Every structure is written in C-alpha cells, then in structure tokens.
Amino acid sequence: MTNNVKNEAVLDSAHVGDIRGAFGTIRHGDVAARNSVWQRLRTLLAILGPGLIVMVGDNDAGAFSTYAQAGQNYGTSLLWTLILLIPVLYVNQEMVLRLGAVTGVGHARLILERFGKFWGTFSAIDLFLLNALTIVTEFIGITLGLQYLGLPKEWGVIAAAGLVMAAASTGDFRRFERFSMILVVFSLLLVPVFMMVHPPMSQIGHDLFVPGMPAGGKLSDVMLLIIGIVGTTVAPWQLFFQQSYVIDKRITPRFIKYERADLWLGIVLVLIGAVAIIGMSAALFAGKPEFGNFQDAGAVAAGLGKYHSHLAGVLFAVALIDASLIGASAVSLSTAYALADVLNMKHSLHRKPSDARAFYLVYFLLIAGAASLVLIPGVPLGLLTNAVQTLAGVLLPSASVFLLLLCNDKDVLGPWVNGRWTNLFTGLVAAVLVLLSVILTASVLWPDISSQTIVNVLVGGGIVGGIVVIAAHVVKLRRDAETGADLAEEAKPTKLYMHTWRMPPLAQLKPMALSRSNRMWMAVLRGYLVVAVIMVVYKVTQVALLGH
C-alpha cells in the first residue's frame, strides 16, 4: 500500500495515530515534557506492553521445559546463567525497540532493504519455518497442561486456538493488549507454586550469583542444557516481534525512555518465572527417584500433585497453558508482521481482518496448522521440537549480526545509532551467540559430541572471537579519530531533535555502504548458513526415514 505519512518510512498508515495502550492513551504528536511523577506514571502506563509481552512470551512452553529440566536434573546449580543473560536480553531487545520507534519499519523489511533480496528472503523464510515449529511446541505445552487438569485434549486445543485467533482479530489494538496483559498477570501463578514447595532460599541466592557446575553431571550434557537456556532466553522471534509491535503501538522516539522501562519490567518478570521453575523443580524432586530423569513439563505438574498438593499441580498446569497461549500469540504475530512487512501489505492490529486479509490469514493459518498437527496421531512431536532448536541455532547468528549492523547505520537510526561501548559489548555478545549457535547446531546433528570437543570449540572460538571483536573496535576507533567522527559523536544533538527524528522513506535512503571486512564476514555467514541448512535437512530426513 502507499505510504500516507510524509517524510517518514512508516509503511502502514494504521501505524500512525494515538497510542492506545492497555492502561492509557497518548495523543498523536504529543511531545510535551512530563514534569510531575503523576504525568510520568500515566505515560508509562500507556506505553506498557511490548516489553512485558515479549519477555513473558519468552517464558513459553519451551522455556518451561528447559528450566524444569535444569532444576530436576541439576538442582539450582545453573541459576547463575540467568543473571548473565540479563544484559544480553536488555541490549538485544533495547536495540530492536529503538529500531522500531525510530524507523517505523519492521526488522525483516529493514534487512531486505539494506542487505538485499537474498538476506531479506532468507530471514523471512527461516523465521516462518522456525516460528511455525515453535507454535507447535506451544500447543504441545497446552496439551500437557490439559492432560494434568483432566480436560479433553481435542476440545481444549480447539478452544485455545480459537481464543488466540479471536483476541487478535477484533480490529482493536487496545483489546488485544489487555488480553495479553491478563496472560502476563496469570504468569505470576508460578510464584505461589514456588512458595508452596519451600525451596532453600539461601541456596537459591548463592547459586544465582556464584557460578558453578553440577557435581557429577556430564559436561557435554550440562553445556548443551546451558546453551538451551541461552537459546530459550534469546530467541530470534523476539527481535522481529518487539520491533513490529512497537511500530504497531505507534511508539515514537519521544517515548523510547518509557519503553526501556517497560522492557526492564518484562525482564524482571521473565527472571522471576525462570527462577521459580528451576527452584521449584529442584526442591520438589530432590532426593526423589525422578531427580535427574526429566521427562516433560506435564510430569513436573504430576510430581507436584504427587509430592505436594493437587492445588500446586493445578496452578503449575494453568501457568503452563497461560505461557503457551501468550507464546503462540506472540510468535504467530511476529511471523505475520514480518511477512506482511516484506511483501508491503497492510499489517496492523488496528485493522479488522477484512481490511488486512493477508496479515490475518498468515496468523490464522499458523495457529490452525499448529493446533491440527498436535491433534494428529503419530506426528513426531519430538522431532519437531529438535528441529526448532536446530533452526533457532541456524537463524540466531544472522539475526544478531544484522541487528548490530542496522544499529550502526546512520541513515536508518540517525542520532539513535549505537555508541562505541554498546558496540563493543554487543559485538562480544554476538560472537558468543554465534559460538553457542554453532555448538547447538552441531549437538543436534551429532548427538554423541564429546565434552572435550565442546570445551575446545568454546575456548578456541572464544579466544578468536574476542580478538576479532576487540581488533575491529580498535580499528574503528582509529578510523574515527582520523576522520574526526569521534568529535562529531561528542557533539550530542538536542533532546527535541532526538525526540522528533524519524527515518526518511525507504526510497530516499542511500544504498548501504559495507566495509571490506563487513562484506567478508557476510560472505562467511552466508557460507555457514548454506552448510548448516544442508546438514539440518539431511539430519531431519535421516531421522524421519530411519529413526536415528
């Protein structure tokens, strides 16, 4: 559709107007100062939503399984990984919320416009496949919760799918966000379950802040679980979802500060949920035959009913269903947003299905397809779950690299580009994520990978990656010093300029000029992706046909 917004790159006219959040409204064009505490609180309440939804959606069915496995198999010894992931979560999601507020263009479309058709097409297709499989795992979580509650699986799955579809298709953005906020509140059911089990708080406090490895655990298994925690916590769909949702909510640069606060609240909730699941599972199964023998999240609910109380099991099952619902909703939306963005179609929750048919069709088909697969007897759900992990490992490096490059593109972000220290930290994080991605992908393709191989890859890759990132940072500092770019950076723009700067229409942007080193790394990334995809297809085909 045509862009009706002058001097801005916003692709859908529905993305411009009043901010109508679950808890308040901000009029379009309102850039007035918020001087009193009450004014700031009202503004924050209106902005609340994107950060909370994406972070609580991160604690979905897959996260329940991963965190419960960590607690049941290794106690609370891996809690420290959650603390280390806090800055990673914040930096990644802060960059995409900044991209969304400043550009008004979704993540997939920016990749297409700035890096070409290959990368744009790859990102959209890979995201679609990964998200479609992820939504299946959400409905697996729903069936596990229904099973413990004694409710019929077929009717329960159909009702869940219908609820998720209906919530997004009213043509009222505020109504969808209020539905999502209800799910966010229900995610806190994990807290009373945690308190009921009476886990050792002193041990939890120790393991949160003192890194250590489980005694007697096989290093390769522990490392793969740690990588699983990272992959669960830092998922590619989150980047695409939050950027598009910030755009759809009509958040502008004026309110980035408030959206950052929203993100921090979401991170606090995701941390509370993760600690509750790990701590509760560890205390529940300590000294029991089930310790070290994790099955699935449904078995954890059964364990609560067996060793504690039926109420605790019910609350956990309801929390699992709740997490699966918000996960299915957010992941489906991220896909529909991305495809519609790339194909230049209407894509907004402010529109009714009759006014954005393709956008809602993608959303409905993803939900209906996932629900149907779960209900079909004989579908290899375990294979689908492994495929999700593998595809996440394949997509994460490219998503991390593109995010970093886009946040250094001055034509895209203007005065909102990354600072030098943000770049250094983000570069190191991206290097670590790429390294973990390689190990995760390799572990699925070769399940018998040895502990020594993992250690060698971590140490060798960590040293090489650290040297490359630091060297690139030093080279950039020298180049900036020679060109005077560092002096320009020190002359900070005014607050009003920052609050009103938006990316110009895509057609007005100059072609992105990649340095020789950037082009080299893009070629390496393309080669890695080609090899990884071929190996994944081979492995999945082998397992499907031969069963091993």
Q: What residue ranges belong to the model's regions?
A:
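Transmembrane alpha-helical segments of multi-pass small-molecule transport proteins
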Residues: 124-125, 148-169, 186-190, 357-369, ...
